[in-house]
A protein has these predicted regions:
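Conserved beta-strand in the GNAT
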Residues: 239-249, 278, 293, 298
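Pre-Walker A (Motif I) flank of P-loop NTPase domains
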Residues: 26-31, 230-231
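N-terminal pre-P-loop "Q-motif" helix
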Residues: 8-27
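Conserved RecA-like ASCE P-loop NTPase motor core of nucleic-acid helicases/translocases
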Residues: 54-66
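Conserved acetyl-CoA-binding loop-helix of GNAT-fold acetyltransferases
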Residues: 42-47, 296-318
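Conserved beta-hairpin
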Residues: 229-248, 255
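Walker A/P-loop nucleotide-binding motif
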Residues: 31-43
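Terminal substrate-recognition subdomain of acyl/acetyltransferases
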Residues: 1-3, 82-86, 92-94, 106-107, ...
Length: 494
């Protein structure tokens, strides 16, 4: 019995049934289902799983978001996180990617190429979604894409006035994607007062950010309106918005707090990149510098590849540097490198939601910013060989490996031994330490060789710190004790 003829007893509604019939008879290829919230998109994916004859795997940025799919799929539901799926050799007849817009395009391509049939689903026009920018940006990667849309609500009545009120209040409209901003582009700044003096312009910027960035939320809208330390640059083409840049002030921490962050004694809220420069970098005073982090940057799909994004970056100003934190892909890094950014950090593990390592980069603006950027980049180059081997991912910087311990290594090792520096941050210095000493250090050597399975995580970390302290004291007792005394003072400040 065709699904389109099934009775209305918790089974597919007409729109869902028509799409299900098409999917169940689909030859090899990629299909995409987009819908606003409440249209039964996840239920449809679960029904597809329960109806197919072969095997299937489901992936999504978060497993919790697939509960509806699991409920409809029953025993046919098999979930793997994007990073785990990428690293596996799993084969199946179908791949279901829920909220596909949250997964970087290059990773989405890699995953889709491994399965004969792929269904991409994503929410549009809502705080969980990314607008029709998903179809323009991601689905253009797949030739012969079959596109389907659900428009009839299943959680509430069609034409619900509350849904329209919420959509209007939270600027869920994405009609801006249909309009091409034509003409010469000029760059201007956007001040918070724009929401009173010219709300249409502020709305245009927010709608562009929603279309370009997954999960731009009403909280972001509130921040745009009244949060301190926010700066906006806009690329205007006539009356239309062609591009937008959102910067957030960071850094400027007191020296005492910056040192405590470096040592792992403190983790105050906010200051994403500024704190990371201290906590994962080599300078205890890194977080004292002032910078502006790129929170969002977007260019209208019809005006991309014209250099507008680079112009927005060049127009930006900051105290010491501009910074950016992003899920690393070759494509994204190519853009940031063209803007003049320098890679200063690569995360130690893939994010389960995106399958990407977190990368951080700086664009120095002041002399102090140049010094910090050069120091952080040189550290990354010097450690690159060890970090790449440990992560299993090549870091796109010059290999400047040195096996000899230097003063930066001594400070790093003391921070690990006598404070709370992370193992992943200190792993290159620890590798050089093992090359420099002729001592057993069984926990350290076993950890490096991947053979330490007899310890719990906390117990092993304590043992690693203990052995590092012992090695430093054997190498140079006065030096190790002076560093220990200095670092221990950094946990006390006004």
């Amino acid at each position: 019995m065709p699904l389109s003829n099934m009775p209305a007893s918790g089974e597919p509604q007409r729109e869902q049934a028509e799409i299900l019939d098409a999917l169940l008879t689909m030859p090899a290829g990629v299909a995409a289902v987009t819908a606003p919230r409440g249209r039964g998109k996840s239920a449809l994916a679960g029904m597809l799983l329960s109806g197919i004859q072969g095997s299937a795997v489901v992936t999504a940025p978060a497993k919790g978001a697939t509960d509806v799919i699991a409920r409809f799929a029953g025993e046919h539901f098999h979930f793997m996180a994007p990073d785990a799926l990428l690293a596996s050799t799993t084969e199946a007849d179908w791949l279901i990617v829920d909220e596909a817009a949250a997964i970087p395009g290059p990773l989405l391509e890699k995953l889709a190429s491994r399965f004969p049939r792929v269904l991409l689903t994503t929410t549009v026009q809502g705080y969980e979604g990314t607008g029709r920018g998903f179809l323009l940006k991601f689905c253009a990667r797949f030739s012969g894409l079959r596109r389907y849309t659900l428009s009839t609500p299943v959680r509430w009545a069609a034409g619900c006035p509350l849904e329209r009120t919420v959509a209007n209040a939270l600027l869920f409209d994405d009609a801006l994607i249909d309009r091409k901003p034509a003409g010469e582009v000029r760059l201007t700044s956007l001040e918070p007062g724009i929401w009173e003096s010219d709300p249409t312009r502020g709305t245009g910027v927010y709608e562009l950010l929603c279309a370009a960035h997954y999960r731009t939320s009403p909280l972001d809208l509130r921040r745009m309106m009244d949060a301190p330390g926010q700066h906006f640059a806009v690329a205007q083409a006539g009356a239309e918005i062609a591009g937008a840049l959102w910067l957030v002030e960071e850094g400027g921490l007191p020296p005492e707090l910056s040192r405590a962050v470096w040592a792992g004694f403190r983790r105050p809220r906010g200051n994403l990149v500024a704190q990371s420069l201290a906590a994962h970098g080599g300078s205890p005073l890194a977080a004292t510098l002032k910078g502006r982090r790129v929170s969002r940057i977007a260019v209208h799909p019809h005006r991309q590849r014209e250099g507008i994004g680079q112009r927005l970056i060049r127009s930006a100003s900051g105290e010491d540097y501009l910074s950016v934190s992003f899920g690393y892909t070759d494509e994204l890094w190519r853009f940031w490198r063209q803007c003049g950014f320098v890679l200063v950090r690569m995360g130690s593990h893939r994010e389960a939601s995106s399958g990407c390592y977190t990368a951080m980069a700086l664009l120095p603006l002041s002399e102090a910013g140049h010094q910090l950027c050069e120091q952080a980049h040189q550290r990354l180059c010097r450690d690159m060989r060890v970090l790449s081997a440990w992560n299993g991912e090549k870091i796109p910087v010059t290999d400047s490996w040195e096996a000899t311990l230097n003063s930066d290594d001594w400070l790093e090792l003391a921070g690990f031994a006598f404070a709370h520096r992370a193992f992943s941050t200190s792993v290159a210095a620890l590798t050089r330490l093992l090359l420099a000493v002729d001592m057993p250090l069984p926990a350290l050597r076993g950890k490096m060789e991947g053979n330490m399975h007899d310890f719990g995580r906390k117990a092993l970390l304590a043992k690693l710190r203990e052995e590092t302290a012992y090695a430093l004291e054997r190498l140079d007792y006065p030096r190790s004790q002076q560093l220990k005394a200095d670092i221990m003072q950094w946990q006390f400040f006004q």
